[in-house]
A protein has these predicted regions:
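Conserved recognition-core residues within compact binding domains
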Residues: 1-74, 79-107
Length: 107
């Protein structure tokens, strides 16, 4: 499953629930023809740059596929692996849980 999340002129951007971000110039094209556009930042997170703004892939996946009924501000990787951006490995969190996860206190 893919969700459209951005459009710049005639370029369309999609995120998959498996953590892949694609661009295409044809909204009706088959996903096999799309281009993977994510890179890594210095901290191990995958990111994309669109119109001068940088977006973390795990956040795009969570916003598209992980419900956030409590409007929590942070996205955690359940298994601690920053490269595992699958929707089922992500959860919304508050600041305290996010900090605790980095220190491995909450495991």
């Amino acid at each position: 499953m893919y969700k459209h999340f951005w459009q710049k002129g005639r370029t369309f951007y999609y995120v998959s629930k498996y953590g892949r971000v694609y661009s295409t110039t044809d909204a009706d094209s088959h996903p096999a023809t799309w281009h993977l556009i994510a890179t890594y930042n210095g901290k191990g997170y995958r990111r994309v740059r669109l119109q001068g703004r940088t977006f973390k892939v795990h956040r795009l996946v969570a916003e598209a596929f992980v419900p956030n009924p409590d409007q929590l501000p942070y996205v955690l990787h359940k298994d601690g692996d920053r490269e595992n951006n699958r929707w089922d490995n992500l959860e919304w969190s508050d600041r305290q849980s996010n900090h605790g996860g980095r220190l491995n206190i909450n495991k």
